């Protein structure tokens, strides 16, 4: 018996043949990003809100929080204007604040979003940053085995607990709160993550493709273990996730935009698994005119949020075209 494990929308999706050069379906280079300009606050700034919801896992009921980026110009009373939602998961040992309001000296994702939206390079969206841990203090995940289990199981919490709360509180495309309503609105939803958040992303694709159409794994490959706990190679990982997707009616209706760096600890493993997906996983179309798998690497890119937010600066205008 094997199970997958990985390292740590949208109203309209960009057609594969129209993607920008830096994310063509081969190992493309990522151009430089004007980080100094982006790090300055935009004139039109979105807001950061904290959302509380009730989550369930393994028989436990708990209160959890997520940070929500609400774009400039959002009007709660204007029900005619609806927004796509990006769910973005942090890396191991981090929390709900790591993307949008990081306590470090690199530019925050909120500034990236503000500038892209203000400049008209992407349409306004909601961005939700939850945690796979029980809370922001990493309670319940003192061991790596516990943390990886949480990432593997998060797809259930996303569909049953988080999406219904987020997407009924804000003006989105969700109509109802049951699983059918979530599935019907999947085209307006994306999921991404960094490091162990990429682990969560690959798991979401494998187990919950019915709820989300577009995926953004950032510096994280797919891990598969055998019954003895031995990590399998990239080919086995690719075949595993392909087999999981074959069980879904949405096996031919998803897109993956992957990014990493040449100096990232997850760089070569992620490159290997992407190439294996293209070779051994028929549901993943890579290096083809109708590609649904895209991958790019940043020269000297390392395993930290500063570079991850650069990848998002480049990816989001493709996925959330204005």
Spell out what each predicted region is.
Residues 12-322:
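Non-catalytic cap/lid and distal C-terminal segments of serine-dependent acyl enzymes
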């Amino acid at each position: 018996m094997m199970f997958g494990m990985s390292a740590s929308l949208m109203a309209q999706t960009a057609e594969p043949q129209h993607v920008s050069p830096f994310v063509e379906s081969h190992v493309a280079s990522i151009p430089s990003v004007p980080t100094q300009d982006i790090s300055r606050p935009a004139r039109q700034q979105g807001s950061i809100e904290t959302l509380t919801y009730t989550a369930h896992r393994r028989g436990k009921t708990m209160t959890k929080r997520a940070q929500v980026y609400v774009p400039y110009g959002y009007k709660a009373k204007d029900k005619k204007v609806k927004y796509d939602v990006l769910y973005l998961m942090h890396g191991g040992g981090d929390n709900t604040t790591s993307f949008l309001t990081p306590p470090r000296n690199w530019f925050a994702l909120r500034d990236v979003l503000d500038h892209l939206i203000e400049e008209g390079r992407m349409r306004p969206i909601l961005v939700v940053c939850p945690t796979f841990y029980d809370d922001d203090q990493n309670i319940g995940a003192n061991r790596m085995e516990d943390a990886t289990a949480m990432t593997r199981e998060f797809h259930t919490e996303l569909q049953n607990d988080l999406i219904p709360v987020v997407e009924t509180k804000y003006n989105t495309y969700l109509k109802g709160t049951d699983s059918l309503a979530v599935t019907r609105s999947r085209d307006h939803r994306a999921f991404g993550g960094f490091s162990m958040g990429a682990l969560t992303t690959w798991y979401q694709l494998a187990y919950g493709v019915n709820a989300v159409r577009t995926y953004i794994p950032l510096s994280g490959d797919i891990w598969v273990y055998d019954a003895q706990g031995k990590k399998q190679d990239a080919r086995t990982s690719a075949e595993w996730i392909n087999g999981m997707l074959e069980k879904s009616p949405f096996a031919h209706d998803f897109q993956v935009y992957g990014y990493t760096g040449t100096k990232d600890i997850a760089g070569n493993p992620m490159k290997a698994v992407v190439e294996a997906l293209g070779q051994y996983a028929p549901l993943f179309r890579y290096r083809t005119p109708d590609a649904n798998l895209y991958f790019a690497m940043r020269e000297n890119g390392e395993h930290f949020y500063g570079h991850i937010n650069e990848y998002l600066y480049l990816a989001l205008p493709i996925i959330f075209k204005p």
